[in-house]
C-alpha cells in the first residue's frame, strides 16, 4: 500500500468505526464523547481499552445447534495439557486481565509491557468463543479421557490446528470490534499515524483469516480432516511449556527467507506445542494450498538434529507468539535474567520486533552448518526445553 494511504484515512473510504458510512460523513468531524486524557499517550489508552473489551460468541459454523451459554473454552486442554504443567493449580502466562506496565523510554516515548503472572488452570488460555455444545462435541477426540496424541490420526492433527487457528482468530476479532468501539467513543484517535497503521494491519489480517476460517468451517461441517499438511516433531520427555499460535515465521532453520506472503496475502502456520506424560510434540500445520510455501521448512525440521530444532523454537516462539504457558517448575528453574529476557521478548512489537527478528536470522545464520552443540544448557539464554 502507498505509504500516504497507509497512515491516513480518506474521506471516501468506509469509516473505521464499522458503521458502513463514509468516513467524511461519520467520524471525521465528530467530537470525542469523553474527556481527553492528556497525561497518557493515546496509544496507551487504546491498549487499555482493547484489553478490557469482552466479546462472547460461538464461532462454530453450525449456528442451528448453538445454545445460549457461551463458555470459557480452553485453547489448550485443561485436563490434558495445562494440568500437566501446573503446580498447585497454577501456571505462568501473560495476564492480559491486568493493566499493562507503562515504561518510558530514553527517547521520551512510551512502551507497554504485560507481565507474566500465575494464573489458575481454569482460566489459563480461555476465551468466550464457543457455546457449551460445540466446545464439548468438536474437540472431544483430544479432550479428557481421549487417547494420547496419535501422529497418524488426521482428526487429532486437524483439531489441534483448528484450535490454534480459531482461538487466534477470536483474539483478532475482539481486537477489531474493540477498536471500532473505541473509534466511536474517541474519533480523535485516528489523528495518530500509529493508530491508523494499526487499523490497516488489523483489517488486512481479518480479511486473510476470514478466508481461512471459511475453509476450516467447511472442513468441520464435513468432517474433512485432510485439508492440512502437518509436520509432527516428537521430543523425548515431558517439556515444561505449551503453546498455540497462528503465525508466519520469516526464516527457516538455515536462515533462508520463507516466502510466506504472496500477492499481499500472508500464509500462516497453525502451531501447537504440548507435553504428554513421557513425550512431547511440536505440531506445525498449513493448508494444502500453502504446502509449497512450507514444504522445505517442514523437511528441515523433520531431518535436523532435535536439539537444533529446540534451539530454533527457543528463538522463534517467544518472539512470534504471546500464547506460551510456562510450568512453575520451568519458571522457577530459570534465573532472574532468563525470566526477564523471556518477558522482554514476548512483549516485543513494532520496530523492536523487526530488530530482534533480524537478530534471530543472524543467530541461525551463525550455526547454519552446525549439527551439534545444542544440548541442554547450550542453546541460549531462553531455554524453553530445559530439564527441571
Indicate residue ranges for each PLM-predicted region.
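Extracellular repeat turn/loop positions enriched in glycine and acidic/polar residues, especially those
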Residues: 18-20
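Charge-dense, low-complexity intrinsically disordered regions
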Residues: 202-388
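Metal-centered catalytic cores of metalloenzymes
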Residues: 40-47, 52-55, 119, 182, ...
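An N-terminal structural lobe/cap that precedes and organizes the functional/catalytic core
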Residues: 6-11, 28-135, 140-141
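Internal, well-ordered alpha/beta segment that forms a basic, Gly-enriched binding/recognition surface
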Residues: 89-200
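Pre-Walker A adenine-sensing motif
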Residues: 2-3
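Extracellular cysteine-rich, disulfide-stabilized repeat modules
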Residues: 13-16
Amino acid at each position: 500500500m502507498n505509504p500516504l494511504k497507509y497512515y491516513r484515512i480518506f474521506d471516501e473510504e468506509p469509516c473505521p468505526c464499522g458503521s458502513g458510512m463514509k468516513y467524511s460523513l461519520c467520524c471525521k468531524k465528530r467530537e470525542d464523547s469523553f474527556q481527553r486524557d492528556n497525561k497518557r499517550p493515546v496509544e496507551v489508552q487504546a491498549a487499555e481499552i482493547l484489553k478490557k473489551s469482552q466479546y462472547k460468541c460461538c464461532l462454530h459454523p453450525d449456528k442451528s445447534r448453538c445454545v445460549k451459554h457461551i463458555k470459557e473454552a480452553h485453547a489448550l486442554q485443561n485436563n490434558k495439557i495445562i494440568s500437566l504443567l501446573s503446580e498447585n493449580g497454577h501456571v505462568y502466562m501473560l495476564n492480559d486481565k491486568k493493566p499493562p506496565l507503562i515504561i518510558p523510554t530514553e527517547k521520551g516515548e512510551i512502551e507497554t509491557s504485560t507481565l507474566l503472572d500465575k494464573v489458575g488452570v481454569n482460566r489459563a488460555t480461555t476465551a468466550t468463543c464457543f457455546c457449551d455444545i460445540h466446545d464439548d462435541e468438536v474437540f472431544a477426540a483430544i479432550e479428557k479421557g481421549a487417547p494420547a496424541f496419535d501422529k497418524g490420526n488426521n482428526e487429532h492433527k486437524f483439531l489441534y490446528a483448528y484450535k490454534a487457528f480459531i482461538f487466534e482468530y477470536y483474539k483478532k476479532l475482539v481486537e477489531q470490534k474493540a477498536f471500532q468501539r473505541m473509534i466511536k467513543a474517541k474519533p480523535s484517535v485516528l489523528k495518530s499515524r500509529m493508530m491508523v497503521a494499526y487499523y490497516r494491519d488489523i483489517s488486512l489480517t481479518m480479511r486473510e483469516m476470514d478466508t481461512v476460517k471459511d475453509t476450516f468451517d467447511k472442513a468441520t461441517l464435513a468432517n474433512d480432516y485432510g485439508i492440512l499438511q502437518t509436520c509432527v516433531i516428537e521430543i523425548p520427555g515431558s517439556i515444561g511449556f505449551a503453546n498455540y499460535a497462528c503465525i508466519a515465521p520469516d526464516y527457516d532453520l538455515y536462515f533462508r527467507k520463507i516466502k510466506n506472503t504472496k500477492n499481499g496475502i500472508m500464509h500462516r502456520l497453525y502451531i501447537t506445542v504440548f507435553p504428554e506424560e513421557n513425550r512431547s510434540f511440536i505440531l506445525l500445520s498449513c493448508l494444502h494450498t500453502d504446502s509449497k510455501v512450507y514444504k522445505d521448512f517442514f523437511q528441515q525440521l523433520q531431518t535436523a538434529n532435535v536439539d537444533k530444532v529446540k534451539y530454533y523454537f527457543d528463538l522463534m516462539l517467544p518472539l512470534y507468539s504471546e500464547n506460551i504457558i510456562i510450568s512453575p517448575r520451568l519458571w522457577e528453574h530459570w534465573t532472574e535474567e532468563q525470566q526477564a529476557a523471556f518477558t522482554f521478548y514476548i512483549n516485543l512489537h513494532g520496530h523492536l520486533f523487526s530488530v530482534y527478528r533480524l537478530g534471530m536470522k543472524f543467530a541461525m545464520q551463525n550455526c547454519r552448518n552446525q549439527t551439534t552443540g545444542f544440548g541442554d544448557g547450550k542453546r541460549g539464554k531462553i531455554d524453553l526445553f530445559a530439564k527441571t
